[in-house]
Every structure is written in C-alpha cells, then in structure tokens.
Amino acid sequence: MALWGGRFTQAADQRFKQFNDSLRFDYRLAEQDIVGSVAWSKALVTVGVLTAEEQAQLEEALNVLLEDVRARPQQILESDAEDIHSWVEGKLIDKVGQLGKKLHTGRSRNDQVATDLKLWCKDTVSELLTANRQLQSALVETAQNNQDAVMPGYTHLQRAQPVTFAHWCLAYVEMLARDESRLQDALKRLDVSPLGCGALAGTAYEIDREQLAGWLGFASATRNSLDSVSDRDHVLELLSAAAIGMVHLSRFAEDLIFFNTGEAGFVELSDRVTSGSSLMPQKKNPDALELIRGKCGRVQGALTGMMMTLKGLPLAYNKDMQEDKEGLFDAFDTWLDCLHMAALVLDGIQVKRPRCQEAAQQGYANATELADYLVAKGVPFREAHHIVGEAVVEAIRQGKPLEDLPLDELQKFSHVIGEDVYPILSLQSCLDKRAAKGGVSPQQVAQAIAFAQARLG
C-alpha cells in the first residue's frame, strides 16, 4: 500500500506506478534508511511519541531487518513497493504490527531521503578515498622501480625534453592527490544532517536535531528546513569530483595506450588486462585502458544531467529530485571500477627501458640544453633559441643527433661553443640540470617519491 493513499479515490494507473516508482535504484539506500529510522525512533522517545519499550522493540526489529538486507539484498527488488522508505516501513509493520505505523510521526520522505542519500555518500566516498590512495600507492611503487627509465616527455605529442617514467607516474600521483582532497572537502560540506526538517517547514515536534545528527554520525544539523530538503549541492559537488577524477584516469589511460603502441613501444601491458581480436591472431588490445577512457564520458554526462535537472527547480522538494540517484550511483560505481582497474594495469606493466632510452635520444630533446649552454656563455636567450633552431635544422639535414655534430660545425652557428658542450648534451645532464623543486632530476624525483610515501603512510 502507498504511504499517501488516503487522499485518493482511484488507484494509480499501473503505467504511472512504474514510471513513478524508484525502488529499482533507491534500494541501494536500504541500510541508510534503516539506520536513519533507528535514530528517528530514539528522537521520538525524547518528545513522548514512543515509550522506551516501544523504541526498543522497533530498534530490535530494524536491526534484524538490517542484517536480513545485508545477507540478502536482492529480496528488496522482489517487492512492488514504491520506494525504499515504503519497503522498510512495510517490512517493519510486518514484524511489529501497528507499532510500526508510529515510526513516521513528524518525519517526511523529503528529509528522510535527503538524510539517506547523505549517509550513502559518506559511506561511498570512504570507499573511493581508499581506492584512490591504493592507486596512488601503486603509482609511487611503479615510480620507485623506474627512476632510471629515461623516456621522452611530450608537448603537442611531439618529443620535447627527456623525463623519466618515474616522473610521469608522479604527475598522476599529484592529480590523484587533488582528487582525494576534493572528496575530503566535499565530505565536510555534506556532513550536516537534514533529518527533522520534515516536508519543508520543519517538524512540529521539539526534537533536538543536533543530538539526532550526532546519533547518525553527522558533524551538525542543517540550519534551514527549506534548503535542507531541496539541497543537492553535495550530489553536484561529488559528481564534479568524479568527473574531474575520471578526466585524470582518462588521460592516464590515453598516455599508456600510446606508450603501449608498436610505434612507441615504451611499455607492455599484462595479458591480464588485455584482449585479442576475433580475426587477427597477433593482436593484443589495451581494452582495460580503452574502457577507462571511454567510461569517462558517462560520468561527465551524469554531472551535466544533474545540473540541468536542478537549474530551474523552485523551493522546496520536487519529484525531479528523484533523478539525483541513478546518475550519482552509476558515476561512483564507474569511478570506483576505473580506480581499481588502473591499479591492476600498473600491477603487471613492463617498462621497456632500452626503447624508452632510444626514443629519448631522438627528436632533439636536448635542444633546450644547448640553448641554456649558450645563455651561460653570455648569449641572450632569444638569440640562443634562434641559433639552436638553425643547428637542429642542420642536424636533421645530416640525419644526426645534435651531440654527433662535430665541433667545427657547431661553431658555425656560434663561436662560443666549445668542447665542453658535449657533456651538456647527454641525457643524464639534461635530467640532472632540472634540479629545482618539482623537476625531473634524480634527486627531485627521489624526494617526491619519499614525500608521497610519507603522505600515503
């Protein structure tokens, strides 16, 4: 039976019921709905609606139901209840009879679902933070094992300057650390309880909402009932964090897809995260990474969809807000799966050091070093830049790297060039000179690894 049937003289059309019902997705809030109901039953004792004995009976029944749901969650979807609140209340009435009908006193599904969703978000963000830190740790470990793997760094997908595979890994550690921080910040803002705000104007019972918030593990209670039941900022904020996090994972995937190509050949992915072709026997496709890259779009879509849903809603609650859950649930599921998969990809990756080194030595990645060398000899940088550009053109014409041009040919471009230029043009020198904080020098990379290890514990 619907929770609101008394006002109506006709039954809902079955097509409307199917359109309106949300149990098929909000069943995921079952545990939070039960936990919230236990806390609400305690609050009802403080205002004389329930006796201590009645509350104990309700709490015992709700705890039994909670264990039952954890053991067999699929039972919820066997019901034709409208939503998870109706299902929980129906099951409670089955267990304790008429007493179960007293539990909803002073409470609306509006503040109830807002509370359930915030509790779910807190639980799920905790899982995401764990997965995020696990991936950071995997990246740090990969970096530690590849500090000497020199490879080309890219701008515009053109070889630019030499870096190391470790430095590349640490770039993604920084991105993931920001994702972690965004989630932690979002938790601070959603950690306020809307329970006790009723439908929109507050509850008529003098419940201590701060005490109630504490029972549920919230830092405090919300301050305005109208805002409380219509606020979905936390959904937008978490979807935004997910969207940004998935952009980072998509870029991570794209880099490794490129590194894994036959043309680059910097890494080889494990058989455990690749698949073959139904036609071409030789193929080993980076499906795990391509799926991470592909799934990024659906998370961006969830954020955009939720913004469009909320942008024109008047205060307070509107049924449009039922659309807050499916996109959020899917986005969080997707992000969590991709974090785990990215860590699995790293677990079996092989870095091909000789090929990385060979590629780093090509493409005139040491051209900037020659320009800096000229600057150290007193040549203005803009002039040095032009000189080196001309030298690169000549090296390309001869099919040689810069360091293989004889001294007399280099001196045609600038008389200040001497024999001391050749050590400067080595890959190791290119790395060693980048010793400012955040640079690719071995010392800076080692410090960055140590810092990340200390932060991650």
Swiss-Prot record:
What pathway is this protein a component of?
Amino-acid biosynthesis; L-arginine biosynthesis; L-arginine from L-ornithine and carbamoyl phosphate: step 3/3
Which Gene3D superfamilies does the record cross-reference, listed alphabetically?
A: Fumarase/aspartase (C-terminal domain), Fumarase/aspartase (Central domain), Fumarase/aspartase (N-terminal domain)
- Say where the protein is mainly found: cytoplasm
Q: Where in the cell is it found?
A: Cytoplasm
> What InterPro entries does UniProt report for this protein, alphabetically?
Arg_succ_lyase_C (IPR029419), Argininosuccinate_lyase (IPR009049), Fumarase/histidase_N (IPR024083), Fumarate_lyase_CS (IPR020557), Fumarate_lyase_fam (IPR000362), Fumarate_lyase_N (IPR022761), L-Aspartase-like (IPR008948)
Keyword Amino-acid biosynthesis tagged: yes
Tell me where the signal peptide lies. none
Tell me the Gene Ontology biological-process terms attached to this UniProt entry.
Answer: arginine biosynthetic process via ornithine; L-arginine biosynthetic process
Please name the Pfam families in this protein's record: ASL_C2, Lyase_1
Q: Which family does the record claim for this protein?
A: Belongs to the lyase 1 family. Argininosuccinate lyase subfamily.
Protein's name in the database = Argininosuccinate lyase
UniProt organism field: Shigella boydii serotype 4 (strain Sb227)
Source species taxonomy = Bacteria, Pseudomonadati, Pseudomonadota, Gammaproteobacteria, Enterobacterales
